[in-house]
Swiss-Prot record:
It is found in: Cytoplasm. This is Histidine biosynthesis bifunctional protein HisIE. Keywords: Amino-acid biosynthesis, ATP-binding, Cytoplasm, Histidine biosynthesis, Hydrolase, Multifunctional enzyme, Nucleotide-binding. One of its GO terms (biological process) is L-histidine biosynthetic process. It comes from the Bacteria. It holds the Pfam family PRA-PH. Residues 118-206 are annotated as: Phosphoribosyl-ATP pyrophosphohydrolase. It catalyses: 1-(5-phospho-beta-D-ribosyl)-ATP + H2O = 1-(5-phospho-beta-D-ribosyl)-5'-AMP + diphosphate + H(+); 1-(5-phospho-beta-D-ribosyl)-5'-AMP + H2O = 1-(5-phospho-beta-D-ribosyl)-5-[(5-phospho-beta-D-ribosylamino)methylideneamino]imidazole-4-carboxamide. Gene3D superfamilies: MazG-like, Phosphoribosyl-AMP cyclohydrolase. It comes from Xanthomonas axonopodis pv. citri (strain 306).
Length: 206
């Protein structure tokens, strides 16, 4: 999906604008790691502008006008999808942030939750795959190709298993961390992410 293409669907046509006197709360989530980035409000015009431009645009309750996130700082939020909740009175926008979302220079306006680091690491690996910064170990792996990455996953998997067999907990944790990292790189080398694997696990659980 291009930056100006927003997946909306029919549910947006039945939004309940009356509950909030013409405003709907909007949760913005990182499309790659699913971290909640911020909360804002949209009126119908802000939603239309967001759909048209592909950049998250809110209605400012204090300034009483539309404002596009990042219009001053350049830290815009590129829209990937827009969904509504079951009551059609709240929006969930998945976006890709270009720079920090919080005005304090933080990634999110909310503190990190335990276990959220893996999602952030997945997003970082995806960024490394796109930008290939010089001197990065991750860049080196991508440039060596899928066979080398797969080999590293195999090596780390064996080392993790051996650490478990000998009951060396410190080694087990260290090797598990290495395995997770290289597995993320392998997934990204195939155009996949941790979210895809997690979604499959979730479908099996249901």
């Amino acid at each position: 999906m291009g930056s100006n293409e927003v997946a909306t669907g029919d549910p947006l046509a039945t939004l309940d604008w009356n509950k909030g006197e013409g405003l709907l709360p909007v949760i913005v989530q990182d499309a790659d790691n699913l971290r909640v980035l911020m909360l804002g409000y949209m009126n119908a015009q802000a939603l239309a502008v967001t759909q048209q431009r592909g950049e998250v645009t809110f209605f400012s309750r204090s300034k009483q006008r539309l404002w596009t996130k990042g219009e001053s700082s350049g830290n815009v939020l590129r829209v990937v999808s827009i969904q509504t909740d079951c009551d059609a009175d709240t929006l969930l926008v998945q976006a890709r942030p270009h720079g920090p979302t919080c005005h304090l220079g933080r990634t999110s306006c909310f503190p990190s939750a335990p276990g959220q680091f893996l999602g952030s690491l997945d997003a970082l690996v995806a960024e490394r795959e796109r930008e290939r910064p010089h001197g990065s170990y991750t860049t080196k792996l991508f440039e060596q190709g899928i066979r080398r990455i797969a080999q590293k996953v195999g090596e780390e998997g064996v080392e993790t298993a051996l650490a478990g067999v000998v009951q060396d907990d410190d080694a087990l944790l260290g090797e598990s961390a290495d395995l997770l990292y290289h597995l993320i790189v392998l997934l990204r080398a195939r155009g996949l992410g941790l979210g895809d694997a997690a979604a499959l696990l979730e479908s099996r659980h249901q």
